[in-house]
Amino acid sequence: MNIQRLREARHGYLKMAVAFLPIALLIGCNSAPTGTAPGLAGGQALTPGITNYPMAYVKQPVLTKNTNKKNKAATPDDIDVRDLITSITGSDLYVRNTASAATPEVNVTSSLTNGQGAVRDLDVSPDGTKVIFSLRLPLMENLANDDPKQPNWHIYQYDAASKTVTQLTNDDVTAGHDVGAHFLPDGRIIFASTRQLATQAILIDEGRPQYQAVTTDQQQAIFLLHVMNSDGTGMHQISFNTNHDFAPSILVNGQAVFSRWDTENGGEISLYITNPDGTAEQLYYGANSHATGSNIAGTSNNVIQFLNARQRADGQLLAIARPFLGTQLGGDIVVINAQNFVDIDQPSSPTSTVKGPGQMSATSLGVTTDANLPSPGGRFYSMYPLYDGTNRMLVSWAPCLIQGAGGTTEVCSNSNTTGANVVVAPPQYTVWIYDFDAGTLMPLLSAEQGTEIVEPVILQARKPVPAFIPDSSPSNAAQQTLVNNGVGILNISSVYDFDGVDTAKPDIATQANPGQASFYTRPARFVRIEKAVEIPPKTVRKLDQNDFGPAGMGMREILGYAPVQPDGSVSIQVPAQVPFTIDVLDGNARRITAQHTSWMSLQPGETKSCNGCHTTGNVTDPSHGRNGLTAAVNKGAPTTGSPFPGTYSALFANAGETMAQTLSRISCETGSALANLAEPYTQPCSQILTTDVIYPPVWTNSVTTPQPDASIDLYYGVSVVNGASTEGIPSTPPMIIGNCVPWSAQCRITIHYANPASNPADLFIQNLWTTARGPVVAGVATQTCTNCHNPVSLANQVQVPAGQIDLTSSASTVDPTIVTSYEDVLFQHDELTLNMGVLQDLTVTDPGPPPTQVPVMLAAPMAAGDAAASTAFLRMFDGTFHDPVLDHTGFLTSGELRLISEWLDIGGQYYNDPFVAPVAN
């Protein structure tokens, strides 16, 4: 897509300034660079209105290379946008009674910081009388800037009427970093915090100590959204993620828009929205719009992140677009039509006729987002839309500067920004007003040498005033029960609905009808709900990276399973206030769709509905996760009072209900135990998850359908179903946390590969290879997998392990922190040969040049993160493939195959509990 052409079409032309402003006016004559800056309007008076209101901003030192290596707390010359803790020492909050350079400025935080603290994240109350901000007290020199022993960030408030500063958050028993506060319409405050109040409470329920979970790169405690009263009381957590949720602001409809660092989805930062109580959280914009940043080469494919979004009075969204690092704390300002677009080229509605693109540069200055390269149009640190009807914004902007010969500073030009030795000079951000209608940038405040001014705001009432969204509360007894049980409801119309396309064979309606052959071959049979395990900081528990496995999926636990109904619908109760994801499974409990690459969460009593599934998550695929992007394919029951076509007559539907909703209404709301069905649910409500993988054939019986549906029963233990014994696992089941029979919101299924040293009796994958199996001699099973898959025979002779797979628990010769079997089943490994009684790597000649002997590498029999890709191994045991050397059919039970499958699908981790894994060195 030619973003430049689209931008020109929007603006008509790239409007340059009517005059050039000497940079000396910007930063002080005694340090004036040579040259002029483009796109600046000179000789103009301020538009009436802005000088009538107080103004607040942050003054901070210009960041330069840290030459004081002894001071570990010194501010670096650049800060990654994902680093929400590192502070710029020497920054303070300043206020002027009017927004004019002629009005004296007052440092209102100097008594707290003594010039050695830090201030950031300014926001103005809806009535324009208060400024809320983050402040960090002076750091200790002998500790790193983000060391947990350093002072925390806290939320403070400046009252313009009384001219007083009040601290709102403090270091109580739940202390953490508090940043990015924003006023809600009712006076409460939403902010990002590492306190993780609800998350830490759930850790106690899981039998773990309380700690502040860290990000997936284990660099910082996770910042998540919290809400508190105007005086700092009543603090509670409203967002749940495995990486940061931060920088909230309020839309005119009352919802909060915020930046989310997605864990899986490319690891980028996109915009999400939520109600102030945490309900209705969803993607808002940008998941597939990251490779759209302008660059100095004239194209628009730099990878950018969407930060610090604020809504203009006209409803358009402003955001800072910049890469993670390398653009001197600044970037471009983009205007986003988020009301009509979810991505730059994807409308938010399938019927939308609004022309795109969904975003474009807010100015015509020619700002680029190349890391470590000059930006001809300078860079923006922050923006603040003015709500005075003038279509302007207050910005902190720095012109493009480079280091010239002899240490001089020069304004960028076509002649001095080319070549391999261009050195970008430190930015010098000051305050400007950008007029969208005129396309001009006008100076407002300058700064002395070595100082910059950022985050300017005007203490003016916001117009229109954002709507107030009250916190949700239970509307009936059923919803109150959900709240009491700590769960919400997830409804999926059909897992065969892929981005609005019916992928069922031949279609959903036919496949859902027991009178059709496709009913009995439907591929999607279950969903598995997985939870991310909160990783503690290294000060609490130091982990080895091998513990997480090779799939890069972190540690995970299984919350439970539920059947997919014949129309592909699902209606389930999910634990509230935990990040969870969904896998769609076949009858063997193996994932059949692409891995779901984002986390969801529910509040207690909340019901969240989605149409179906989505494609692989590549940037070429459409975004998902925002309501209304596609129309639902599954329209539900056509009429009220009749069963679905061909199904059991007792399950009568209401018009528009999916099969899952009908089943849950009858079993959960009316209290029916479904006793007349062929195989009753083991729990009274069909929405409740189970630890076992069970499908009761509720939609058919011998009266209505000549061919009844088959049940599926994959148990951990041996059970009796319909009079027949099922094969589970002939030992103890996986580690179970919380109440799982009957299921509760605290239920967790934890699977490890290695022997959990804390509780060796718990089942682990390695145990499968040493479990005794048939044939039975004198009442005792005599065979184990390690009898053959072992470098030493039962006669104590050296041998090549059967199938070149060593399943013993000896230390791996490649990495002694893991056992050999883990190495051989999940990683490519050397083929072995027996040479004169000694095992050696088999080698072949690589012709080169020069010719060399290289080992023969064998593919891993299993794939971490994908049980379906491990089918060649798994089918040797279920009778669908017979090994010509030794038939393995029945060597592993159906329950054991299910255990291996789910362990592979969730990531093939070595451990899935940080407190079971040994402490790393």
Residue ranges and their predicted role:
Residues 55, 115-124, 174-188, 242-259, ...:
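Conserved beta-propeller blade repeats
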Residues 51, 89, 118-120, 127, ...:
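Beta-rich catalytic cores
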Residues 37-38, 42-45, 50-52, 88, ...:
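Aromatic- and Gly/Pro-enriched helix-to-coil junctions and flexible linker segments
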Residues 307-432:
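Loop/turn-rich, solvent-exposed surfaces of beta-rich toroidal or solenoidal domains
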Residues 92-94, 154-156, 224-226, 270-272, ...:
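A short loop-to-beta-strand structural motif that recurs across blades of beta-propeller domains
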Residues 34-39, 100-117, 159-176, 229-243, ...:
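Multi-bladed beta-propeller domains
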Residues 25-28:
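C-terminal motif of bacterial Sec signal peptides marking the signal peptidase cleavage site
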Residues 58-88, 134-152, 191-220, 258-271, ...:
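Short, conserved, GDST-rich strand-edge loop motifs in beta-rich repeat architectures
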